[in-house]
């Protein structure tokens, strides 16, 4: 083989091997904190593959529902008496620092699209927006319809000083009177409604 062909071809093959080794997670979902990524912070929507950002804290179990290789919903299951009161010790979305900063000092509307799971479905679920040591919304309770429906609540996120961050979470859990109960969450939306008046 001619050197003019062999060496460039060998270089291309070597670069392809290095690139495939350096990017082992290139097909994995980018799961982590929920972030606005510099977009319009008036509305943040978590749906589809972004649902992988939910953490199964506490003694809970998450299961992805998929169609055509994409997440369509996430099932949250828990046993009776196994979840504590702290939002970060329950199934939750962790909000990134950019959302903490943008939401601080504002009224936020949280809208969750959910339903009882087909198996062991809960009839009631709860949600809690926590701003860490700054406080939380308390557990908001919703009685569900059989099909997907929107459930919303408002909360005034406490203001923070410049450069000050907390650890914000949105926790979502089934209410479990006995045995195990499960809910399906299709999407979560955060709407920044207005700046909270100074007290």
Segments the model singles out, each with a brief description of its role:
Residues 7-9, 13-67, 197-199:
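Extracellular carbohydrate-recognition regions
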Residues 119-130:
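Beta-strand acidic-aromatic groove motif in beta-rich domains, primarily in extracellular
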């Amino acid at each position: 083989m001619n050197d003019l062909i062999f060496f460039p071809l060998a270089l291309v093959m070597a670069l392809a091997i290095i690139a495939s080794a350096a990017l082992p997670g290139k097909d994995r979902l980018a799961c982590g904190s929920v972030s606005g990524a510099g977009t319009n912070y008036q509305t943040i929507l978590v749906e589809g593959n972004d649902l992988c950002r939910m953490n199964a804290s506490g003694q809970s179990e998450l299961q992805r529902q998929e169609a055509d290789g994409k997440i369509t919903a996430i099932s949250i299951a828990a046993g009776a008496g196994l979840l504590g009161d702290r939002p970060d010790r329950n199934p939750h979305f962790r909000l990134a620092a950019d959302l903490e900063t943008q939401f601080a000092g504002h009224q936020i509307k949280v809208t969750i699209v959910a339903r009882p799971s087909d198996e062991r479905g809960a009839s009631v679920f709860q949600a809690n927006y926590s701003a860490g040591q700054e406080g939380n919304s308390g557990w908001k309770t919703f009685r569900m319809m059989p099909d997907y429906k929107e459930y919303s609540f408002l909360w005034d996120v406490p203001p923070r000083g410049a450069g000050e961050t907390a650890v914000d979470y949105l926790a979502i859990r089934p209410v479990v009177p006995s045995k195990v109960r499960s809910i399906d969450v299709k999407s979560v939306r955060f709407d920044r409604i207005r700046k909270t008046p100074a007290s």
